[in-house]
């Protein structure tokens, strides 16, 4: 049986093997009686030639002659129960760049939308209550779309298997989820589960009223790939404006527990392997506060003090990520490095050629 | 004869007509004896219904019944000689985000390139003198590629016809030109003319030596769409390190004059129309300083004081643009608004989940 590694694994003992994502590992079922509990013995097909220490094997490399491959005794931590949760913040939102009055900047005298700067999206989706609603539920900027797509492509490069996608009902989160799935080439295979319980702390984002989010029908009409069979744990009607910090913390803690228990944890094969039946990553696209409020209860950490919380949340960039892996013991989770790197880029400022170039 | 408008034209007299890019205009050659010099008389097929004041016609709309169309006497400034030059700065370069030591951040212990942050390009092209050369000639970041592509798509939206593309020999400029052409869907139809005379003021960018730019053969091998028949006005060997401001100003002034005289100015058809034979836009992709040093001599303006110059250049963002249009009088150029809007976006900061989320 030949398996393909899903994640990198760094050896922690001399009888363990360095595994890169994409490595092909031969596992002989007859040999497994020698393996200690939770481990398997296998052989890596990866060449060990000094010249190509980082070579990654794919389907074709499988046909390399065995003389170029090295054979290594291999122990793999058997996490047949291992799951992972990737929590990410949405991409750049238009009001982050153009301020609260962004929509006014984009309306013609007769109320039509136009693109006042090339970072505004080329069009807005239809909303039953009119464009005005987008002031409380702003879309991604073009830069936000670029960021989301890039992260999706990077996850694909790392051969991360995403099996479930949950999103806050905020338009920017649904859009981010959609563009990440496009980058992953999983659109429309994996559908987005819109979970109102993932919305931002309402004290920050809904001080007077919960925004009129786009309905499932509207999202579908705008070509968003929504899972219509999904039943939310927290219906929209359960969200209240200006909730207390304690209420937000307990809502977040409840929703992450409900999400993880709704995604199957039993699987028949060893860890690291992208095979049907192996639980893939549960992707959750939500808000900057979600990176702490969803992962800390999962990892068994206490919630942050409400004052520290605001300060911490300000440091989280677009597409900032936290990654939790389930441990050998079921429902024990640990925060580890996300499967892809950070995304760091500069700002691009407004430019007035008349003042700058023509002026004397 | 039905013509399609290439640019918007705002009427300046009551016998002139508002024209949007894409409008179809019927011009009867028999009527032109009534037109004053430099103008033509024509009829707009655009509907004037109050409900759709901004409707833009395309090929299909051509078939609208005449009852929905309005007929207007039309005067068009006849700029049969009119050309336009669009000077743009390259996109975000990797060292702008990651500093001068960017390449060291991306090398494994055995000297292989890897992507230390997702804004680094996924690979570097081959260079005969090795990767080290890219330290003096850095590539675009992924964000820079996004910016370039977006501007190309916006030019296409505005139906701007680009007929000639010139680029500085700096890799970031050639890459920007290529991605703008891809956005314009003109790749590989329009080929890039690499002109060393367009390189940055060497006092800033080449204080000790002129960088080892990629050769034409290397650029072609890396799939850049280079015009191999182009003979540079300023060969690479003519560039000297640490040139004086006066030398830079006179080089820039000479190169823009040579470029405009090398691109045909005579054309048989009226202005605004994207027809074969009508001169399209001459696109020049170069450096922030080029926005002033190329356009000011073209528009007959004196060069800036060298101290003001440095201050002005710092204000120019990625893909900052200046646009010069030739006037009725040949070789008289005026700076006007570029055909597309500015691009303004925010920065994305580095993020350390361990310190931010896990720390207490």
Q: At which residue positions do the language-model features occur?
A:
Chain A
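Short glycine-rich phosphate-binding loop at a beta-alpha junction
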Residues: 161-169, 193, 267-276, 281-285
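Structural signal for hydrophobic/aromatic residues that build the beta-strand cores
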Residues: 5, 19-27, 40-42, 85-90, ...
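Active-site-proximal alpha-helix that buttresses catalytic centers in soluble enzyme cores
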Residues: 9, 68, 76-189, 249-252
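Acidic, low-complexity terminal tails and accessory targeting/binding regions
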Residues: 57-84, 94-103, 200-218, 265-266, ...
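Src homology 3 (SH3)-mediated interaction modules
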Residues: 1-65, 69
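Eukaryote-biased feature marking scaffold/signaling PDZ-domain proteins and nuclear chromatin regulators
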Residues: 1-4, 12-23, 34-37, 80-82, ...
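Short glycine/proline- and acidic residue-enriched helix-loop micro-motifs
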Residues: 130-139, 223-247
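Short amphipathic alpha-helices and their capping/turn residues within compact interaction modules
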Residues: 10, 14, 24-32, 36, ...
């Amino acid at each position: 049986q030949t398996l393909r590694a899903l994640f990198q694994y760094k050896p922690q003992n001399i009888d363990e093997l360095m595994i890169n994502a994409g490595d092909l590992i031969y596992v002989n079922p007859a040999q497994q009686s020698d393996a200690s509990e939770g481990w398997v013995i296998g052989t890596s097909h990866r060449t060990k030639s000094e010249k190509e220490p980082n070579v990654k094997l794919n389907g074709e490399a499988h046909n390399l002659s065995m003389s170029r491959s090295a054979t290594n005794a291999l122990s793999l931590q058997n996490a047949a129960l291992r799951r992972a949760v990737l929590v990410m913040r949405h991409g750049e939102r238009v009001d982050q760049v153009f301020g609260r009055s962004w929509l006014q900047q984009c309306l013609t005298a007769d109320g039509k939308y136009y693109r006042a700067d090339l970072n505004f999206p080329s069009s807005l989706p239809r909303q039953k209550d009119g464009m005005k609603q987008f002031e409380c539920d702003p879309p991604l900027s073009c830069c936000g779309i670029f960021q989301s797509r890039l992260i999706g492509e990077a996850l694909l490069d790392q051969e991360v298997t995403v099996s479930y996608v949950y999103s806050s009902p905020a338009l920017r989160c649904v859009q981010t989820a959609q563009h990440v799935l496009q980058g992953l080439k999983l659109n429309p295979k994996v559908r987005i589960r819109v979970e109102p319980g993932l919305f931002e702390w309402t004290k920050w984002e809904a001080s007077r009223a919960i925004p009129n989010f786009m309905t499932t029908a509207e999202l579908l009409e705008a070509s968003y790939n929504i899972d219509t069979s999904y039943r939310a744990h927290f219906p929209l009607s359960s969200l209240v404006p200006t909730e207390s910090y304690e209420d937000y913390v307990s809502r977040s803690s409840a929703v992450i527990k409900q999400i993880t228990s709704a995604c199957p944890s039993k699987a028949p094969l060893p860890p690291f392997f992208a095979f049907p039946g192996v639980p893939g990553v549960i992707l959750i696209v939500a808000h900057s506060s979600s990176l702490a409020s969803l992962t800390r209860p999962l990892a068994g950490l206490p919630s942050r003090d409400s004052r520290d919380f605001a300060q911490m949340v300000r440091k989280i960039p677009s597409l900032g990520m936290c990654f939790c892996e389930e441990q050998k013991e079921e429902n024990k989770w640990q925060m580890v490095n996300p499967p892809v790197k950070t995304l760091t880029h500069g700002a691009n400022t407004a430019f007035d050629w008349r003042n700058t170039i023509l002026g004397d």
